[in-house]
Amino acid sequence: MASGKDTCPTLPKLTNNCSDESLYKSANKYEEIHLPRFSLKQGMIPRRYVMPWKENMIFRNVNLKQAEVCGIHTGPLEDSLFLNHSERLCHGEDRKVVFQKGPPEIKIADMPLHSPLSRYQSTVISHGFRRRLV
């Protein structure tokens, strides 16, 4: 029979050769990868447009400091705001903030299709007006 004490074999101690910083860097190495996002292609958007302050070499340092304070990306590889008729969405102002700056659009939900005050009694005009509001 076994004695009253349970004996467990002693396991060798492992040495910790990795520091906390190297563990943090290896865990976050995939967060540094950046994939640009673009909007859908539209004919009104230019083929390529670079913001003038990025090309102004006289006041370049001042412009870069101001952009850094505002939180605007100033990297060398993604200098164009528009590329191939698409807008770059990854390094811009948040869409919700942009929409809050403008005046709210008034939507008329109860507009009659034919108004007696209308000069043109066309369903095409009234449907087109409704389509713009939606």
UniProtKB/Swiss-Prot annotation:
Read off the Pfam families from this record.
SPMIP10-like
User: What broad class describes the main subcellular location of this protein?
Assistant: cytoplasm
Q: Which GO terms describe its cellular component?
A: axonemal B tubule inner sheath; sperm flagellum
Query: What subcellular compartments does it reside in?
Result: Cytoplasm, Cytoskeleton, Flagellum axoneme
Domain of life, per the record?
Eukaryota
Q: Does the keyword Hydrolase apply?
A: no
Q: Which GO terms describe its biological process?
A: flagellated sperm motility
The record's listing under InterPro entries reads: SPMIP10
Which keywords belong to this entry?
Cell projection, Cilium, Cytoplasm, Cytoskeleton, Flagellum
The role this protein plays is: Microtubule inner protein (MIP) part of the dynein-decorated doublet microtubules (DMTs) in flagellum axoneme, which is required for flagellum beating. May serve to reinforce and thus stabilize the microtubule structure in the sperm flagella. Involved in the regulation of sperm motility.
Q: How does it assemble?
A: Microtubule inner protein component of sperm flagellar doublet microtubules.
Name-wise, this protein is Sperm-associated microtubule inner protein 10
